[in-house]
C-alpha cells in the first residue's frame, strides 16, 4: 500500500482520535468534513450575526436551545416572543439560546444578516443570533448535520429539518437530549428544562 493511500485512510481515524482526546475536544472545532467525529456541540464553531467566528465551546456548562429562525414565517411571532420570554426567565439559571436564520423553507428569511439583526431587535432579542446558514443538504452547517443524526436528534419521517423553528435541546455537556418539531412552540420546552438546568 502506498504512503499516500495509507495517509488518506488514516486521516479520519487520527482526526477522530484527536477530537476524542481529553483536553483537545474543547480546543478543536469540527469542520465541514469531520462533523461525524464530534462528540458534543462544543466541538463546533459558527459565525455570529456580525460575522465573527465563535467556538461553541463557550456554551460548555450551559443548557442550550438551538433553533433555525425565519422573519417571514407564520410561526415567527409566537416563536420569537416565547424564545425571548424563556431567555428572560431562565438565562440566570444557565439557559442559552442560539438562533440560526435559514432561508431554505419558503424563502422566508431573505434578508441580509444586518436586516435579520434589526428584525430581531424589534423583539428585544438578547439571546445569541448567528449568521444565516443552510440546515439541510450538502451545504448544511456541520453543527446541524451533527445534531440531526444524534440518537435524540433524529426526526420523524427522516432526519431532515422539515420547516422553520425546529428546536434542539442541548445539555450542559453539549449533547442533544431532545428535538422539537416546527409546530411545537418554545413554551413546550419549558417542562423539560428543570431536568437539565
Swiss-Prot record:
<dbReference type="GO" id="GO:0019369">
    <property type="term" value="P:arachidonate metabolic process"/>
</dbReference>
<keyword id="KW-0539">Nucleus</keyword>
<dbReference type="GO" id="GO:0008430">
    <property type="term" value="F:selenium binding"/>
</dbReference>
<dbReference type="GO" id="GO:0005743">
    <property type="term" value="C:mitochondrial inner membrane"/>
</dbReference>
<dbReference type="GO" id="GO:0004602">
    <property type="term" value="F:glutathione peroxidase activity"/>
</dbReference>
<dbReference type="InterPro" id="IPR036249">
    <property type="entry name" value="Thioredoxin-like_sf"/>
</dbReference>
<dbReference type="InterPro" id="IPR000889">
    <property type="entry name" value="Glutathione_peroxidase"/>
</dbReference>
<keyword id="KW-0963">Cytoplasm</keyword>
<dbReference type="GO" id="GO:0021549">
    <property type="term" value="P:cerebellum development"/>
</dbReference>
<dbReference type="GO" id="GO:0051258">
    <property type="term" value="P:protein polymerization"/>
</dbReference>
<dbReference type="GO" id="GO:0035264">
    <property type="term" value="P:multicellular organism growth"/>
</dbReference>
<keyword id="KW-0597">Phosphoprotein</keyword>
<dbReference type="GO" id="GO:0032355">
    <property type="term" value="P:response to estradiol"/>
</dbReference>
<dbReference type="GO" id="GO:0005829">
    <property type="term" value="C:cytosol"/>
</dbReference>
<dbReference type="GO" id="GO:0005634">
    <property type="term" value="C:nucleus"/>
</dbReference>
<dbReference type="GO" id="GO:0005739">
    <property type="term" value="C:mitochondrion"/>
</dbReference>
<comment type="similarity">
    <text>Belongs to the glutathione peroxidase family.</text>
</comment>
<protein>
    <recommendedName>
        <fullName>Phospholipid hydroperoxide glutathione peroxidase GPX4</fullName>
        <ecNumber>1.11.1.12</ecNumber>
        <ecNumber>1.11.1.9</ecNumber>
    </recommendedName>
</protein>
<feature type="active site">
    <location>
        <position position="73"/>
    </location>
</feature>
<dbReference type="GO" id="GO:0047066">
    <property type="term" value="F:phospholipid-hydroperoxide glutathione peroxidase activity"/>
</dbReference>
<keyword id="KW-0560">Oxidoreductase</keyword>
<dbReference type="GO" id="GO:0042802">
    <property type="term" value="F:identical protein binding"/>
</dbReference>
<dbReference type="GO" id="GO:0006979">
    <property type="term" value="P:response to oxidative stress"/>
</dbReference>
<keyword id="KW-0496">Mitochondrion</keyword>
<feature type="modified residue" description="Phosphoserine">
    <location>
        <position position="40"/>
    </location>
</feature>
<dbReference type="GO" id="GO:0032991">
    <property type="term" value="C:protein-containing complex"/>
</dbReference>
<keyword id="KW-0712">Selenocysteine</keyword>
<dbReference type="GO" id="GO:0006915">
    <property type="term" value="P:apoptotic process"/>
</dbReference>
<keyword id="KW-0443">Lipid metabolism</keyword>
<keyword id="KW-0217">Developmental protein</keyword>
<dbReference type="GO" id="GO:0019372">
    <property type="term" value="P:lipoxygenase pathway"/>
</dbReference>
<comment type="function">
    <text>Essential antioxidant peroxidase that directly reduces phospholipid hydroperoxide even if they are incorporated in membranes and lipoproteins. Can also reduce fatty acid hydroperoxide, cholesterol hydroperoxide and thymine hydroperoxide. Plays a key role in protecting cells from oxidative damage by preventing membrane lipid peroxidation. Required to prevent cells from ferroptosis, a non-apoptotic cell death resulting from an iron-dependent accumulation of lipid reactive oxygen species.</text>
</comment>
<dbReference type="GO" id="GO:0110076">
    <property type="term" value="P:negative regulation of ferroptosis"/>
</dbReference>
<dbReference type="InterPro" id="IPR029760">
    <property type="entry name" value="GPX_CS"/>
</dbReference>
<dbReference type="Pfam" id="PF00255">
    <property type="entry name" value="GSHPx"/>
</dbReference>
<dbReference type="GO" id="GO:0007283">
    <property type="term" value="P:spermatogenesis"/>
</dbReference>
<keyword id="KW-0575">Peroxidase</keyword>
<dbReference type="GO" id="GO:0032496">
    <property type="term" value="P:response to lipopolysaccharide"/>
</dbReference>
<dbReference type="GO" id="GO:0016358">
    <property type="term" value="P:dendrite development"/>
</dbReference>
<dbReference type="GO" id="GO:0006325">
    <property type="term" value="P:chromatin organization"/>
</dbReference>
<dbReference type="InterPro" id="IPR029759">
    <property type="entry name" value="GPX_AS"/>
</dbReference>
<comment type="subunit">
    <text>Monomer. Has a tendency to form higher mass oligomers. Interacts with FUNDC1; this interaction promotes GPX4 recruitment into mitochondria through TOM/TIM complex where it is degraded by mitophagy.</text>
</comment>
Amino acid at each position: 500500500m502506498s504512503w499516500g493511500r495509507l495517509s488518506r485512510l488514516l486521516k479520519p481515524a487520527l482526526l477522530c482520535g484527536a477530537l476524542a482526546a481529553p483536553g483537545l475536544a474543547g480546543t478543536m472545532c469540527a469542520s465541514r468534513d469531520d462533523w461525524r467525529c464530534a462528540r458534543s456541540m462544543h466541538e463546533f464553531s459558527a459565525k455570529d450575526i456580525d460575522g465573527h467566528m465563535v467556538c461553541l465551546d463557550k456554551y460548555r456548562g450551559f443548557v442550550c436551545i438551538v433553533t433555525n429562525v425565519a422573519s417571514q414565517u407564520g410561526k415567527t411571532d409566537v416563536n420569537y416572543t416565547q424564545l425571548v420570554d424563556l431567555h428572560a426567565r431562565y438565562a440566570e439559571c444557565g439557559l442559552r439560546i442560539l438562533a440560526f436564520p435559514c432561508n431554505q423553507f419558503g424563502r422566508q428569511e431573505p434578508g441580509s444578516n444586518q436586516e435579520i439583526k434589526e428584525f430581531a431587535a424589534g423583539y428585544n432579542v438578547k439571546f445569541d443570533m448567528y449568521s444565516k446558514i443552510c440546515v439541510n443538504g450538502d451545504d448544511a452547517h456541520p453543527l446541524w448535520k451533527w445534531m440531526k443524526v444524534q440518537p435524540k436528534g433524529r426526526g420523524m419521517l427522516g432526519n431532515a429539518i422539515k420547516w422553520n423553528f425546529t428546536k434542539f435541546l442541548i445539555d450542559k455537556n453539549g449533547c442533544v437530549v431532545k428535538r422539537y418539531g416546527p409546530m411545537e412552540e418554545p413554551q413546550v420546552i419549558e417542562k423539560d428544562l428543570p431536568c437539565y438546568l
